[in-house]
Regions:
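Short, solvent-exposed amphipathic alpha-helical segments in soluble enzyme
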Residues: 121-124, 147-149, 206-212, 233-234
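Anionic group-transfer/hydrolysis microenvironments
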Residues: 109, 134, 197, 221, ...
Length: 292
């Protein structure tokens, strides 16, 4: 979590109100709708600091070799999500930057299709482009950007299944394509960074990157919740959510619940976080350099 006085970045939370994090995780597991265990961890972080009517929590934490307790104010669900928001990198207004003269970087959370041409003017001479999908994309880049600049021809990148409402239990398949014949497509490697914050449209974008001639993912298990959202109303004004369509790779393998395929595993370490390093990005840079 980020600094939250008197807690500091890098402190290890051991318990909240006398309950261990594992115990909190076990308590909420049967009540929350989560696609996989990565999603449960996300919910545990939020729930641990929002699930009381009291004004404060008693938190036990470890800092270095010492342990201590502190009282901290209760958070709402909305601002508790600050704990899992990924750091924002300093990039240009176009949402991109050059890591070096051979590797470009795009932050999907700051990307805009309107800037697509300018982004490619900046990055077109690189040998690899890293697209960071560890925060939610600010624009839908799949057709207007990835398809336009990165596909040499029409590529079937995903399978969607939709229920046939007149025939319960039956589903129809859609196999959309991105791109068109384009001799000037970007020929370098395209690397998508993913982790436990990668969800829904971000996962669909990662799947699309993997369909490109030199596309791959670097990171760790995603939330496995791509597809649209359909509400199911419940008594008492409550509701729950499902996806009313299936999302599969072109070979028919699943993406929902399990998350997207990870081509190269990489995740942060406590030591790396404390040192201010982005070890997932570092891994992607090493892979990009090895592909040149």
């Amino acid at each position: 979590i980020p600094a939250w006085p008197p807690l500091r970045f890098g402190d290890e939370i051991l318990s909240v109100n006398g309950k261990s994090i594992d115990s909190i995780r076990s308590d909420i597991r049967k009540y929350v709708s989560c696609s996989n265990e990565t999603a449960v961890g996300f919910r545990t972080t939020v729930y641990a600091f929002t699930s009381t009517d009291a004004d404060e929590y008693v938190v036990e934490y470890r800092r270095g070799n010492a342990t201590d307790t502190v009282r901290i104010a209760t958070r709402t669900d909305r601002n508790a999500r600050e704990f899992i928001d990924f750091p924002k990198y300093a990039v240009s207004e176009e949402g991109c930057m050059l890591i070096n003269d051979r590797i470009g970087y795009i932050d999907a959370a700051q990307f805009s299709n309107e800037q697509g041409r300018r982004i490619m003017n900046v990055l077109k001479n690189t040998e690899a482009i890293i697209i960071d999908l560890r925060r939610y994309p600010s624009d839908f880049m799949i057709f207007a950007f990835l398809g336009k600049y990165f596909a040499p021809y029409a590529i079937n990148h995903v399978i969607f299944t939709h229920p046939v409402y007149s025939l319960p239990g039956c589903f129809r398949e859609d196999r959309p394509a991105i791109g068109h014949d384009n001799p000037d497509y970007y020929r370098g490697a395209v690397i998508a960074l993913v982790d436990g914050n990668t969800i829904s449209q971000a996962e669909y974008t990662a799947i699309t990157v993997q369909a490109l001639p030199r596309g791959l993912t670097v990171g760790s298990t995603t939330l496995g919740a791509d597809g649209n959202i359909a509400e199911i109303p419940l008594p008492g004004g409550y509701k729950t959510l499902i996806s009313s369509l299936g999302v599969y790779y072109p070979d028919g393998s699943e993406t929902q619940r399990c998350g997207v395929r990870i081509d190269h595993w990489a995740e942060p370490t406590p030591e790396g976080l404390l040192a201010g390093r982005d070890e997932v990005l570092e891994a992607a840079i090493r892979i990009a350099e090895s592909m040149q």
